[in-house]
Amino acid sequence: MMKQYLQIKEQNQDAILFFRLGDFYEMFGDDARKASKELDLTLTTRDKDKNKPFEEKVPMCGIPYHASDAYIARLIAKGYKVAICEQTQDPATAKGLVDRDIIRVVTPGTVIDAACLEEGRSNFCAGLYLDDTCAGFSVCDISTGKTHVTAFQGPDRAEHLLNELGRFSPAEAVVNPAAYQCGPLLSLLQDKLHCHVERLSAGRFQLQEAERTVRTQFGDEAAGRLPKGNPAAALSLGALLGYLHETQKTDLRHVDDLDYYQQGQFMELDLTARRNLELTETLRSKEKKGSLLWVLDKTRTPMGGRLLRSWLERPLLSVTAITRRSAAVGQLVDHTMVREELALALSGIGDMERLVGRIVYGTAGGRDVVALKNAMARLPHVKELLSAFDRGRLGELAQLDTLEDLTDLIGRTLCDDPPFSVREGEFIREGFDPEVDRLRGILHGGKGIIASMEAAEKEKTGIRTLKIGYNKVFGYYIEVSNSFKDQVPETYIRKQTLVNGERYITQELKDLEHDILSASDRVSALEYELFTRLRQELSGHVARIQATAAAVAEADCLCSLAAVAVKNNYCCPAVDESGVIEIHQGRHPVVEAMRPDALFVPNDTYMGCTQDRVSIITGPNMAGKSTYMRQVALMVLMAQIGSFVPAKAARLGIVDRVFTRIGASDDLSAGQSTFMVEMTEVSDILHAATDKSLLILDEIGRGTSTFDGMSIARAVLEYCADPKRLGAKTLFATHYHELTAMEGTLPGVKNYNIAVRARGEEIVFLRKIVPGGADRSYGIEVAKLAGLPDAVVSRARKILRQLEEESGRPAAAPAPREDQVSFAAVAEGEVIDRLRRTQVDSLTPLEALQLLYELKKKLT
């Protein structure tokens, strides 16, 4: 047996080998040591030589095969690959050693077991190809069969590859040697995305073989959509498919829907922008709560959740496609009863995509198939609800296939509550198969059958004392007393002589004995055979099931966006090609959702193609500059996925890319300081942005000396504003108040500030964006709010006055009087600030009434 193990292990050196022995998966040698450490398993040995030290014996450990999913999940999470070696021969019929073989290699990017997967997130394995002229990118989620591929050419090919990796965030990537040697690419994969990288030889990226593999998997029509002038798409996809076939040992028939997309179909976002805008997870905690996805995701199915995440990762650039989607959201907003009933109907559908994936793989159990049946049973009601809409995208979704024939097939075949394992039996429905029913009758009614046979033999022979008994030596027998042995028929075969009688057998009794004793094994084997046939038949309908699952997922997403729009009072934006960003009373979607009891101060925004193209925003820290800039970017993204936006009204011209330069930390591992990171990011932005891009730039130049920083900030601002160089719409937050002088001298530049009301040595943040530059920085006041000791704050004020006297001017030039915020806005801000600081639970009724009088007085 160990020789067989070593032969199989030799072919799977890079994986932990799960070697099936009876009801256990065993691991030996180094695999056992690793598994023992990672899985907290007891390390033992098969060597029985008591004289040999333990450290010289071959170590081993094992796990029950029925609990393997949880153990595999833990190993995969730690970055290991697991090769599963099964017994491919029935031990009962094997002559000598049982045949074994690898049935599948589980890697981080090829997981299909529910225990290893996150419901609302796709698990992609990527294929990357890079050379001197082009780059290819492909991803496949084998748990659902979804496959995407694209390719790039030119000097920016590697940058586009990086952005696609940030978009899909694969769990594993297979790469060609040139891609592996690309430092930024490898760093992104391993250090930031924590992606398992599999380096393949150059021989695995041969165009002719790649094209053949793609054609075999997807067909001629799909393969023909790949670009003829750029072989990188086929090379990356062909190598990826080859790797999947090699590790999964199956034809992957559910991987049959190829999405080839081109640059220009979707907004491109780099990893920095995705993280700064917190699209799918927060920057600090890496949690979904607090992200834009958390606000928008009210989906009822796992596949709907994954699709919504995909929409957020791939904002559209086509006005037609955006309007089509937002119109469907609008229909659901207007039809409250249909929307709410649809949400309820979707709630019980579950994860059809991944269920059908496990069915194709042959790993689905009876409970998985019944779960699919229960999901499909809800489809007629979903179709009925969608039929309320006879036009637009919802009208198209109403044409979904309800799969009633498959629901009926599963319902006729399987019982409603099958056992955990299909090897346990008792899951084929009664009446479906006559032989199963007969064997079950024998199995459950053995005593009754024997009693009936005994009565029949008594009547046939006339022997009143005849009885049928059983023992382990002879099995079933017929016992006749000596007084009646002369009446025994010739068909009886004497088996044993007793003092008081004789024991006989008959052929009929032996056949019945065989049936009774073997019924359990036979019925289990027959039920498993029938279940396997059912799985195979369902696998033949995989394309139908996937198409329906896709329609359900889209309906779920549209329903979610509509529910959020209604709950949060969003508006439907007008999306066009104007290039204008015009928002009336816009709000930050996440901030207001995280603080539902607080009053969010809305703000207007106008950014044109020529006038007001660049907004210089000044004001103290904590006043809300970053929140305001992010909310503009998030509303653009929301509009371009077809969502409503948090505003009273909005007109949003298509933005091709959103760039952010917000905050930084020293990248010590790369030997880069905060300032170097900042300058690198700014450089990347200025090289990649276009006049259709939106730039969010916060505190450019703060990581160096004042004059250096101010010079860089001004030069960057001039470059962004100049239509001959870039001319991109830019939100530029700064503490360099000298830059406000550029309004009026640099076309397209407009000054704004965050309104602040000073009351003695205290300040109130009004959170309102108003025209004009800030009159001062309020740095010392912010320091006081942060809790610096009074002595430090007092000393800082003295030093500030001294510096102002020495320089002959205040720390910042006062803003023009006409740009000051109105008294009403100030009063409103003071009221909001007072309410936020009030501990409501500690107020007496009289104190609460007094507070209301005070607040009302401020507003009147």
What function would you assign to each model-found segment?
Residues 29-32, 230, 300-301, 311, ...:
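ATPase nucleotide-binding head domains, primarily ABC-like/P-loop NTPase cores
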Residues 11-13, 76-78, 119-121, 130-134, ...:
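Short flexible coil/turn linkers enriched for glycine and charged/polar residues
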